[in-house]
Amino acid sequence: MEEGAKIGREHEQQQQQHGRVNGSGRVAAVGGGSGGGGDEIEIEVAAAAGASPSRQHGGLHGDVQAPTWKRFLAHVGPGFVISIAYLDPSNLQTDLVAGSSHRYSLLWVLLFGFIFVLTVQSLAANLGIITGRHLAELCMGEYPKYVKYCLWLLAELGVIAATIPGVLGTALAYNMLLHIPFWAGVLACGACTFLILGLQGYGARKMEFTISVLMLVMATCFFMELGKVNPPAGGVIEGLFIPRPKGDYSTSDAVAMFGSLVVPHNLFLHSSLVLTRKMPYTSKGRKDASTFFLLENALALFIALLVNVAIVSISGTICANNLSFADTSTCSSLTLNSTYVLLKNILGKSSSTVYGVALLVSGQSCMVATSYAGQYIMQGFSGMRKCIIYLVAPCFTLLPSLIICSIGGTLRVHRIINIAAIVLSFVLPFALIPLIKFSSSCTNIGPYKNATSIIRIAWILSLVIIGINIYFFCTSFVAWLVHSDLPRVVNAIISSLVFPFMAAYIAALIYLAFRKVNLSDPFPTNSVSGEIEVQHIQIQEKQEDLGVHL
């Protein structure tokens, strides 16, 4: 017994010397016993995994030996939650306009855009896998006080802007299907979102499963519509693989479509969701996890791409036919609301009902996903406990969106969605640049740094998107200023405020791009997102190890 107690004390000293908690709530310990050999192992303690500590400990080695398809299925979920952002009412409206104005000639923009999205999202997923922290936590630990709080404010602003189209789309769908007032639809949308977010108490997988089902329902609805319209397969395939912009404003519309594909909250969300999975704390374990998450994300994005192609093809086929004067006028300025009327006039009431269901699912799933991202963003930047975040974050993101949409009403839906898109494009660089900086930092992720070619492609395409967004913002503002009916004095005052603001905006981006990453510990010592029974598991490990030696 004395020998056993001595071994136990030695093991406890090793735990105190080497044990630490990484950013995803995992206990990392350097084994120094007979079977340790200096290998690092990771014990999953994330609450969302839904397993007891003893089961999680036992699964470290058993999961690696499981069949490949089982390990892949264990990683399915985050990609589908991420893909919802590319099926929200804002993208739906953009696709409808692109199809009605240019038929199938801009489909290639979607294809290349989704390839870029897959690249960027894989960087976000790998960042979480390698560092054990999500993007918000890394920003909080890396940047000076005022910089990180500005990043937090901008990230929350992006979540609110991404939530607004979801609220509008859901409220419109309720009005189409149930003929209830717009404001009542807004309230119903908020209530349903709170209810679905309550599934977090049963684990992250339940939330991911719910959002995945909503995504598949939406895909089914639009594929049903596509079957009724029956677009020419040759024209769709040609538009998908051969860049041939046709018609007025085709170039600007293509640029706008590409620039709106990457959304900032997805970068925070993806780096967070990967931390809800059990992963062995080894080089092979990380490599396998990265591969599985990449394949899962590619599958989900492929489904999202098909749905977007279907939406463009539906509006492109309908508006290319011989229509009445009223329907032709509707096609010239297609919106979420007018599409319902157009489908009802041409394909019948059943078709418009299917569209209404798809819009409802699109808006509601968008609301849930963005609110979910807001929770991780607030947790990472504030350090508050999850139980508080679950209550505060949805109110912080949902209430402003609900108020804005209630005031705007149905007549301003198109304008509000456009303003929300501008805000998202404004916020995007402040999430995208830190992500690429962390992903390419040798001090932050060391030997697991992404390939140089991937980083270069990400930088080039990111600079293109940032340049597009800045260009459109400046040109839109100048056009508004030229055609404004305001007095010259007021225009001069507005200009004196906006242009210095844009100069400060560009200076902030340059600061983020050229600032050296100083965060050198790839396995953090403290992370609120994983404060789940860490001490209990450490004690349990000591007891189990002591029992083995005895």
Swiss-Prot record:
As for membrane topology, the entry says:
Multi-pass membrane protein
Q: What is this protein called?
A: Metal transporter Nramp4
Domain of life of the organism in this record?
Eukaryota
Q: Does the keyword Membrane apply?
A: yes
Q: Where are the transmembrane segments?
A: 72-92, 105-125, 151-171, 177-197, 207-227, 255-275, 292-312, 354-374, 388-408, 416-436, 457-477, 492-512
Q: What is the lineage of its organism?
A: Eukaryota, Viridiplantae, Streptophyta, Embryophyta, Tracheophyta
Task: State which gene encodes it.
Answer: NRAMP4
Composition bias (Basic and acidic residues) maps to 1-13
Q: Which UniProt keywords apply?
A: Ion transport, Iron, Iron transport, Membrane, Transmembrane, Transmembrane helix, Transport
Q: Which organism is it from?
A: Oryza sativa subsp. japonica (Rice)
Q: Where is this region: Disordered?
A: 1-37
Is-annotated flag, keyword DNA damage? no
Which residues lie in Low complexity bias regions? Answer: 14-29
